[in-house]
Regions:
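Alpha-helical macromolecular-interaction surfaces
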Residues: 22, 91-92
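Vicinal oxygen chelate
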Residues: 1-11, 34-86, 92-121, 132-134
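Conserved active-site tyrosine of GNAT-family acetyltransferases
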Residues: 23-28, 97, 125
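Polyanion-binding surface elements
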Residues: 14
Length: 134
């Protein structure tokens, strides 16, 4: 049986945080992402990444959207989803992120497939990979 619907595309990724505006300001200041939209009540803020959108939404918005909302970050363990930011200078971008308040999870390293990557955790608990293009 073939799929009878048109192919889907990735529209955006939403990361739930305590303060979406603070998260978007951090990503603008630290990674140079451009703010794209913000809800007047501060419950949602969206960034333009060039290919798709990265958004931040409040836990309260998740609670309002569906029963049970989403899990809050575990301070001892990153979540099971990561945001990957692509840079030609992984080492430099990682230094900037650490200076801005991120926590290092894995220093920049060259992978067998030729990509250079580092793993950090942002101040809001999000797992972030900084990597060269694939």
């Amino acid at each position: 049986m073939t799929n009878e619907i048109p192919p889907l595309t990735l529209g955006w990724t939403i990361v739930y945080v305590e303060d979406p505006v603070a998260a978007s300001e951090f990503y603008a200041r630290t990674f140079g992402l451009a703010p794209d939209f913000a809800a007047p009540d501060g419950s949602y803020a969206q960034m333009d990444t060039g290919q798709t959108k990265l958004a931040f939404a409040s836990y309260e918005l998740a609670d309002a959207n569906f029963r049970g909302g989403v899990a809050r970050p575990d301070p001892d363990r990153p979540p099971n989803v990561e945001v990957t930011l692509v840079s030609s200078d992984v080492d430099g971008a990682t230094r900037v992120a650490l200076d801005a308040g991120c926590t290092s999870l894995a220093e920049p390293v060259d992978k067998p497939h030729g990509q250079r990557v580092a793993y950090i955790r942002d101040p809001f608990g999000t797992l972030v990979e900084i990597g060269t293009p694939m």
